[in-house]
């Protein structure tokens, strides 16, 4: 009986937070959603290292750009790792609070999963 309860709990937890993953050559995008509404998007990307090698300075500059572009409430988290002359960034955005969704191919007044998926596919991302 206990095993059945644990199994049902796991099924419930995983069904409550569905997600989709899209990849390109240097990016991985994980979309969390409820029905057709995107909640958060996590973007993992890797880029060549520029002149600045300090991860905290890169993070602060990147956060400023993201906040100016999407709105301060939209940026949930940014992690920067500098390794092997590359920058790895993990950015989490709350799509429900982004001020201009058209940058992500979304014309609806809400963060539409369907429209964002079309945008990703047209931008050469592949669904995993």
Pin down the residues of each PLM region.
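Positively charged n-region of N-terminal signal peptides that target proteins for export
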Residues: 1-4
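Hydrophobic helical h-region of N-terminal Sec-dependent signal peptides
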Residues: 6-10
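C-terminal motif of bacterial Sec signal peptides marking the signal peptidase cleavage site
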Residues: 12-15
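Subset-of-secretome marker
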Residues: 17-128
């Amino acid at each position: 009986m206990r095993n059945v309860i644990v199994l049902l709990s796991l099924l419930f937890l995983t069904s409550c937070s569905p997600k989709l993953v899209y990849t390109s050559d240097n990016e991985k995008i994980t979309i969390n959603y409820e029905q057709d509404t995107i909640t958060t998007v996590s973007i993992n990307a890797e880029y060549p290292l520029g002149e600045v090698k300090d991860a905290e300075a890169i993070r602060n500059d990147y956060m400023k750009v993201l906040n100016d572009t999407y709105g301060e409430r939209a940026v949930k988290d940014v992690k920067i790792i500098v390794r092997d002359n590359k920058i790895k960034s993990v950015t989490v955005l709350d799509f429900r609070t982004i001020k201009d969704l058209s940058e992500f191919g979304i014309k609806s007044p809400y963060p539409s999963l369907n429209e964002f998926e079309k945008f990703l596919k047209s931008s050469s991302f592949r669904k995993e």
